Amino acid sequence: MDQSPFPDIAHQTASFSDGLVLDCGTTLQRLEVAYRTYGSLNAEKSNAILICHALTGDQYVAEPHPLTGKPGWWNALVGAGKPVDTDRFFVICANVLGGCMGSTGPRSRRDHGADEPWSIDFPAITVQDMVRAQKKLVDWLGIERLFAVVGGSMGGMQVLAWASLFPDRVFAAVPIATAPYHSAQNIAFHEVGRQAIYTDPDFHGGHYRTHGVIPARGLAVARMTAHITYLSEAALTRKFGRRLQRQNALAAPVFGERFAVESYLEHQGSSFVRRFDANSYLVITRAMDYFDLAADHGGSLSAAFRGTKTRFLLVSFSSDWLFPTAESRAMARALNQVAANVSFVEIVSDKGHDAFLLDEPDFHRTVAGFISGAAEAAGLQ
């Protein structure tokens, strides 16, 4: 019996019997894409915005999460009267291929019809595979062209892949706090997290569900390690400094009293294992590591966008050391080389990579302004 800390719950899904051919050469004979929508699709089906989530996100972008009860992960940006205005636009967000919130992934049953899940045997996927699965959903919804595709971090990678693979299907693209490839440093951090999962005694070679356990300790450490990269030193100092949980530190047993930042990271790890699957973490982090748009186009990033009519807004954050501003500037130069319509804005913030998820007024004004201008150019009322 599966003793996963989070139950299998019903999600809104679209099923595709024709499956999906993956970049690795494997064909998924059965594909399900879990998704949520907000707002109304207009009669012309021209007001759709696709939101692409990051590594540990899901489709519940603007509503309480069904497992945790927490507000939608991008409530700051998406909703009625917000920069991505659900009173004006039809907003779609899908759980990525390989995820664990309803879309086909390691928790899904194998193609041959057995009740056992894919688990660690789920095939390797790419960010482009994720986008092709999303395109099936968009086609199924009857939408010929998306007004915009918006996403941050890994979501931004998906935005870039959409604009490269299906330029005629995307009027505007907003890749945020992202890059056209995953750096060696980012791959290294991911590998530390993966090794923490692999070496957890409850991992069982990736078949932990058949043993009724999960590699909770390893997954928690992976989350803790990753979470450090999402913050800046200034943000950590402001929030925690060197504050101890209690003042009389040396009176505590063994190693003394813990620092507040330690407790914070432990909370991040322990709460994460209640809503995320370890095998999905392995699959998705590897997909991010494989992402390299230039390598896919003969080493030329500009070639990935040659002939595009999509208009772009690139956004970076000054204190983001996971996806630094230099990488967004490189994307802007590549787009300029093919005469693409591109704007680039660096938001000054000391909140690190996660600033794109937080209350950043300059960022919100930037996105709202771009979407308003793009809507006017697209003839949207």
From Swiss-Prot:
Which GO terms label this protein's molecular function in UniProt? homoserine O-acetyltransferase activity
Q: Which domain of life is it from?
A: Bacteria
**Where is this protein primarily located?**
cytoplasm
Quote the subcellular location field of this record.
Answer: Cytoplasm
InterPro entries attached to this UniProt entry: AB_hydrolase_1, AB_hydrolase_fold, HAT_MetX-like
One GO location term (cellular component): cytoplasm
Catalytic activity of the protein = L-homoserine + acetyl-CoA = O-acetyl-L-homoserine + CoA
Q: Which Pfam families match?
A: Abhydrolase_1 (PF00561)
Q: Which residues form the AB hydrolase-1 domain?
A: 47-359
Paired cysteines (S-S): none
Question: EC no.?
Answer: 2.3.1.31
- Catalytic residues of the enzyme: S153, D320, H353
Per UniProt, which keywords does this protein have?
Acyltransferase, Amino-acid biosynthesis, Cytoplasm, Methionine biosynthesis, Transferase
Record pathway? Amino-acid biosynthesis; L-methionine biosynthesis via de novo pathway; O-acetyl-L-homoserine from L-homoserine: step 1/1
User: What's a single GO BP term from this record?
Assistant: homoserine metabolic process
Residues that bind substrate: R223, D354
Subunit organization:
Homodimer.
Q: What job does the chain carry out?
A: Transfers an acetyl group from acetyl-CoA to L-homoserine, forming acetyl-L-homoserine.
Family note: Belongs to the AB hydrolase superfamily. MetX family.
Task: Please name the HAMAP family in this protein's record.
Answer: MetX_acyltransf (MF_00296)
User: What's the protein here called?
Assistant: Homoserine O-acetyltransferase
